[in-house]
Amino acid sequence: VTEIVAEKWEEAAARESLLDLCMPERHLKSSERIREGRLPADGLSLAAHGPDGRLVGTVRLWHVTAGPGKPALLLGPLAVHPWFRACGLGARLMEAAIGTARARGHDTILLVGDAPYYARFGFSAQKTGALWMPGTYERHRLLGLELKAGALDGARGLISPTGAQVAVPSLADLIAAASAA
């Protein structure tokens, strides 16, 4: 596997195919409700490519609030092609994501995931008990990592998206563009 790099917008279709392979039911998850219609945080969409150049791993982070006045990042989805799961690529993607978020000055990262896996990166449910997600989720899987000590102290409330919205043209703009063509 080559180095972990910033994801390119041209990789959107390959990323969606990889996510469909690894997480076919991801659209049903509460984390998706938070990500819908939003752009990932700048510089926090990472990709890994196999020896042939194809996308084999991806992770993204999204701007959210951990309750009122508590900016945070939501990590996910993290996906690695099944052929590359035994080589530590998921861990490398996690370490790169955490390191990049820290270098960019972010305070905390939240995720919904398997606590035993994410504990090795410092994630825990210790300070997420007063936070909740929209929709159905397994509370014990809501985990946090403070990049700055005390960043989750007093975090309470609904985790809400705050990132840039995806620009969607209005119906009138689409009609005008079609008429002009």
Where are these regions (language model features)?
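A short beta-loop-alpha structural element at the N-terminal edge
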Residues: 2-15
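Active-site rim helix/loop that mediates acceptor-substrate recognition in acyltransferases
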Residues: 20-60, 64-65
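Short loop segments at secondary-structure junctions
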Residues: 50-53, 83, 146-151
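Conserved glycine-rich acetyl-CoA-binding loop
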Residues: 54, 68, 81-92, 104, ...
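A conserved beta-turn-beta hairpin within the catalytic core of GNAT-like acetyltransferases
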Residues: 64-75, 85
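Conserved acetyl-CoA-binding loop-helix of GNAT-fold acetyltransferases
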Residues: 75, 80, 86-99, 110-111
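Conserved active-site alpha-helix within GNAT-family acetyltransferase domains
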Residues: 103-107, 113-138
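C-terminal "cap" of GNAT-fold acetyltransferases
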Residues: 132-178
